[in-house]
Each structure stands twice: as structure tokens, then as C-alpha cells.
A protein has these predicted regions:
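An amphipathic, basic-hydrophobic helix/alpha-beta surface used to engage anionic
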Residues: 35-286, 326-329
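Exposed, interaction-prone extracellular/peripheral surfaces
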Residues: 166, 197-201, 207-427
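Short, structured coil/loop segments at alpha-helix boundaries
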Residues: 21, 25, 89-92, 156-158, ...
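Acidic/proline-rich low-complexity IDRs
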Residues: 1-3, 129, 161, 421
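Extracellular/lumenal glycan-associated context and N-glycosylation machinery
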Residues: 1-52
Length: 427
């Protein structure tokens, strides 16, 4: 592109050439051609600038800082005036340095620029493209080059650690049994102990007896199985609030906490998010650390959209459910007429937990007042919870209003749910 100086040169040169033709003046012709030649020469003398970006890490937690390094090199044989602009996602904050730099690079020179950003909200983010604007030696042309180098960063939710969860393991004859590193019924050898009157003779270790003349009994590793399926409501209604504090964010963090706790107990955990065709994800049940990574990867990218209810998600999950799978629903329960009927269908075959983020409390804190509309919605929600409780569901309301759920309060509610009388609503 031409600068204002180049436009002036072009206009003056063209005008002088036209006037020279009309006046048959050779001197004006030469002067006009000289001005135009400046434009031609500066266009030919292009600068060769190279730039690239390096992101310190590709996976961080919410609130952590990310260091970005830009490397610029002038491969031309003359000095270069360069403007750099690194495009950033709107959700991140610049905390140190700048993603826009103005540089003067010597011939063959290179420089290194750094800036630091903070990502307060989970998600998959792209950095780039990197825009490089350079001017020629005469300041007549400038060119903008887009370096198509895209960097990807995943910001994972920061979730509280739970102390307990009211889900019990059960003995199973399925082939997916999980070793718990405890003595009990199983097939893998665990240890030996002294014989106690009443122990079956087939468990006596006769080789040890032959060597020590003492009766010792084999112990085997206990194997339990507990499938749990977490269903996270990601409908459009769950984004009511601020980008950092809303029902979906509270639900995502709670889902991550529950999944982490159950997987540490060597259980098998699956996940479904529901709301619309673009945010419905299924993670089949599985054990171990890799399963937690799979679940967190889905929770990172889920967005609030769509109006599909709990019944649709339950139908998608049926092919993964065993008769004793524990279902854990995390939903504000607002404007979902399918919850009650779906809960009635699974009342006799599955343990059902409902954790409901208090969306009305979030709206009240934003609005600064509790209106009659909020009162009616909260009353309607309490009636739904009581109806779910009548089917045997274990329900609890999770307070909102904070970016990170109150772990002490959640642990207190879970401790209360762990008491023998489970059929009640915890407000």
C-alpha cells in the first residue's frame, strides 16, 4: 500500500508528465519521471522480515499466566521499520508487556519480545495470526504480512477437591472389576497372614507351612466395581449471569471435582453434556488418570447453547448404563419439563443424585435485588426438587455467586448426604 508521501509523489509526477507533454518541456518531463522512479525503485527494494511465536505451555488452569515469546529477524541488507501485532482472544487479559510492538531493526538484526497473559475463563483458545507491517527505505510503501502461525492453548477449569461423596461400591462378577489394593474377594494375590480358626483350608499356603511349620493363609486383592455417569446441563439457560459466574461454570467445576474424586477411588466414570447438537458430548465410562483427562478435555470446551432437556441426554446414556450405575445430574433445573418424568423412569434401577447450582442467587447478586420473578422461579425449583426426592433421588442445592464453588460448604453438604437418611433435600 502507498503512504501519503507516495501518493503525493505519484500525483506530482503524473501532473508534471502531463504538463510536460502539453508544454513540450523536457525539464518538466525529466522531473516528473524522477518522482515516479522513486516509487518504482522503492517497490522493487522489498524488505525480508521473519517473525514467529512461541507459547510457553499449551495447558494451564484458570487464572494461571502464560508467557508468549515473539522472535523477529531482519534478513534484508538495510534497516527496517517494523510494526508487530499479535492477535489475542478477547477472553484473555494482558498482564505484562504488550502484544503490539514498534521496532527498528538493523540489517541482519534480530530481537526477542515477550509478553504475559492471564486466562480467567476455561476454554480452547487460539493465538494469532501474527501481523507484520513493514515500510520501505523511502517511506513510500508499506506492506502488511500475515504470518499464518496459529498457537493453541487449553485452559482447564480450576475445581475444588472433595473430601467424600455418598456413592458406595458393590461386589460384581463383571469382567471390568477394579482392584482396590485391599484384602477381600478376588483372584490376584495380595499378601499372607497367620491362620485364624475358621479360615478355609484351600487358602492355606502349604509351601510356607513346609518351610516354617506355621500355618499361613493367602489373602487376595479385593475387587469392586462402581460405574458412575455424570450428566452436565449446558442449555442456553445455564449461561445466565456473568461469563465467570453462572450455572454452567459452577456445574463444570463440580463435575470435574466429582469425576476426580470417584476416579481416585478406582471407579469407572462417564460424562455427558447436553443442550444442543453442538455441545452434546459423550465420554464412555472408564477408569484411571487418562479418563480424567478425557473428561476435563470435554468440560474445557463445552458452551451454553440449545434447549434439549435431560430426557435426551438420558436416552443417549442408556447404552452405557449397567443396572447399578449411579447417575449424577448437575443442572439448575430451570425450564426443563423432562426431568421429573425421566427421573421416574430410572427410580427403581439406578441411584440418582441431583446437584443444582442456585441460578437465582447468581441473578439476584447481579441485579442487586430479589424480585417476585426470582421468588416464583425459586419456589418452582424447590417443588421440582421435592418431586425428585419423592422418587428416591438425593438432591442438593449448590450456592452460586462465586467463580470457584465454596469447597467447605460443598463438602459439608456431601457429608450430610452421606448420613443414613438420604431421602431429603439439602437447601
Amino acid at each position: 500500500m502507498l503512504t501519503l508521501k507516495a501518493v503525493a509523489f505519484l500525483s506530482a509526477g503524473a501532473l508534471l508528465v502531463v504538463v510536460a507533454f502539453m508544454a513540450l518541456d523536457l525539464q518538466l518531463m525529466v522531473l516528473g519521471l524522477m518522482l515516479l522512479s522513486f516509487l518504482a525503485v522503492s517497490k522493487v527494494m522489498k524488505l525480508n522480515i521473519e517473525a514467529d511465536r512461541k507459547v510457553e505451555t499449551e495447558r494451564v488452569l484458570e487464572g494461571e499466566r502464560i508467557k508468549v515469546v515473539l522472535k523477529v529477524r531482519n534478513r534484508s541488507s538495510r534497516e527496517a521499520f517494523v510494526i508487530l501485532y499479535d492477535e489475542l482472544p478477547p477472553e484473555v487479559r494482558l498482564v505484562r508487556g504488550s502484544n503490539r510492538q514498534v521496532l527498528v531493526l538493523e540489517a541482519g538484526g534480530k530481537t526477542r519480545l515477550e509478553y504475559t497473559i492471564e486466562a480467567p475463563l476455561r476454554g480452547h483458545y487460539t493465538f494469532g495470526p501474527l501481523k507484520v507491517r513493514r515500510r520501505d527505505f523511502f517511506n513510500l510503501h508499506f506492506e502488511e504480512e500475515i504470518v499464518e502461525e496459529i498457537s493453541y492453548v487449553s485452559v482447564y477449569p480450576r475445581f475444588p477437591e472433595l473430601e467424600k461423596f455418598p456413592v458406595k461400591s458393590y461386589q460384581s462378577s463383571y469382567f471390568e472389576m477394579m482392584p482396590l489394593h485391599l484384602t477381600g474377594l478376588g483372584y490376584e494375590f495380595f499378601c499372607i497372614r497367620d491362620y485364624i480358626k475358621g479360615d478355609p483350608l484351600k487358602r492355606i499356603n502349604w509351601k510356607v507351612y513346609a518351610r516354617t511349620r506355621e500355618l499361613m493363609v493367602n489373602e487376595y486383592e479385593k475387587e469392586n466395581l462402581n460405574d458412575a455417569f455424570i450428566l452436565v446441563d449446558a442449555r442456553e439457560v445455564t449461561k445466565a449471569g456473568t461469563p465467570l459466574v453462572n450455572s454452567l461454570e459452577v456445574g463444570v467445576k463440580l463435575a470435574a471435582s466429582v469425576a476426580s474424586f470417584l476416579l481416585k477411588g478406582r471407579n469407572q466414570v462417564g460424562l455427558i453434556t447436553y443442550g444442543g447438537p453442538n455441545n452434546s458430548y459423550v465420554v464412555p465410562p472408564g477408569p484411571g488418570k487418562n479418563q480424567l483427562d478425557n473428561i476435563l478435555s470435554v468440560l474445557v470446551g463445552v458452551r451454553a447453547q440449545g434447549e434439549e432437556g435431560f430426557k435426551v441426554a438420558l436416552d443417549k446414556a442408556r447404552s452405557y448404563l449397567t443396572p447399578r450405575t449411579t447417575l449424577i445430574l448437575i443442572s439448575p433445573l430451570d425450564f426443563d419439563e423432562t426431568v421429573v418424568n425421566a427421573a421416574k423412569e430410572i427410580a427403581n434401577s439406578h441411584r440418582f443424585f441431583v446437584f443444582s447450582p442456585n441460578s437465582h442467587e447468581i441473578e439476584r447478586e447481579i441485579a442487586g435485588a430479589f424480585t417476585s420473578k426470582h421468588t416464583m422461579l425459586e419456589l418452582e425449583k424447590r417443588l421440582v426438587l421435592e418431586e425428585l426426592q419423592s422418587f428416591g433421588a438425593v438432591t442438593a442445592t449448590i450456592p452460586g455467586g462465586e467463580a470457584l464453588p465454596n469447597v467447605a460448604l460443598i463438602n459439608a453438604k456431601l457429608a450430610e448426604l452421606s448420613q443414613p437418611n438420604l431421602k431429603r433435600v439439602v437447601a
